[in-house]
Structure formats: C-alpha cells, structure tokens
C-alpha cells in the first residue's frame, strides 16, 4: 500500500502541520484522530489496514490529518473563547488545505469525512456545516456537544460549532 508523509507550514494554523495519506486514487476519505490522537493514529490502530483492499484497488484514498485538540477544546489553560477560536482555525486548515489537497490528489469534487470519539465530532461538525465540500460522513461514538469545554461561555462561534444547537435551526436549501 502506498503511504506518504506530508508536512507543511499551515497558514491557517500558523504552525507546522502533519498528515499521512494512503493510496493513489479513489474516493478521498479524511479520517480525524480521537481527542488525544495524532495523524498516525488510524494507521497504528489498524483502521487503515481494515480498508487496505479498497485502498490497493484504487477505490479509496485515505487522508489522516493531525489534530489541534490539545490547543483548542482540551486546552484548559486558555479562555473558552480562545479554544473555539483555535478550533475555527483548525477547521479552516482542514477546509482550505487538507480538503483542497485531497480533491487535487484524487480529482473528486467532494470528500468523505470520518472519525471516532472526538474525531467523530470533527467529522460531523464539518460535514453538517459544509455539504458543498463533503458528500459522506462516517462517525462512531462522537462527542457532539462542546458545552462541557466552554464552562458557560457562549457566543456565536460556540453556537455554530455545537451541532445539537445549530442543527435543529437549519432551514436553508443545503439541508
């Protein structure tokens, strides 16, 4: 199976960012790591090997970006507004850097996203907010309510990153 390591300076995060990719063509699937996980977690836990036949056949190409959870939601040394701000920077890095790279590498116009645990939150939140870029969502045991990370702080950025709050109020043509 073709495996590539990527590292670049993310303009959205203003720091180095790492990612592993597996495969050479096929539906691009972005796999988010769990809360404390890194970009190599899906490989280390056997998730990539579980779909190796699809990767080798060119049906799937897997993209495993790093996370910034310890700089955002799990960074209890900063104010909750800074946590959500860092999360938004991460989301923008995924949208503008990772997804665009995945589309370029595969020729697909949209990507699939997946994740377990807090990776499930990232997958679902980005899929719900950006159906123009994402056509499949696979999530398992996601932690979707961010209120436990913001300790009573609540503003528009929190609202628009908390699916249990914004999803019931959607009424536009995207949904």
Predicted features and spans:
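Non-catalytic cap/lid and distal C-terminal segments of serine-dependent acyl enzymes
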Residues: 1-175
């Amino acid at each position: 199976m073709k495996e590539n390591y990527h590292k670049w300076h993310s303009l959205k995060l203003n720091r180095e960012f790492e990612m592993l990719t597996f495969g050479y063509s096929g539906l691009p699937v972005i796999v988010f790591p769990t809360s404390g996980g890194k970009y190599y977690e899906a490989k280390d836990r056997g998730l990539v090997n579980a779909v190796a036949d699809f990767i080798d056949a060119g049906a799937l190409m897997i993209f495993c970006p790093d996370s910034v959870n310890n700089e955002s939601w799990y960074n209890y040394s900063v104010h909750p507004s800074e946590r959500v701000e860092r999360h938004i920077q991460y989301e923008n890095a995924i949208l503008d850097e990772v997804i665009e790279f995945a589309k370029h590498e595969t020729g697909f116009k949209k990507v699939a996203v997946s994740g377990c645990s807090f990776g499930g939150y990232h997958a679902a939140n980005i899929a719900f907010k950006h159906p123009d870029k994402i056509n499949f969502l696979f999530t398992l045991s996601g932690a979707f309510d961010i209120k436990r990370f913001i300790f009573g702080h609540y503003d528009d950025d929190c609202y628009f990153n908390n699916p249990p709050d914004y999803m019931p109020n959607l009424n536009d043509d995207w949904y």
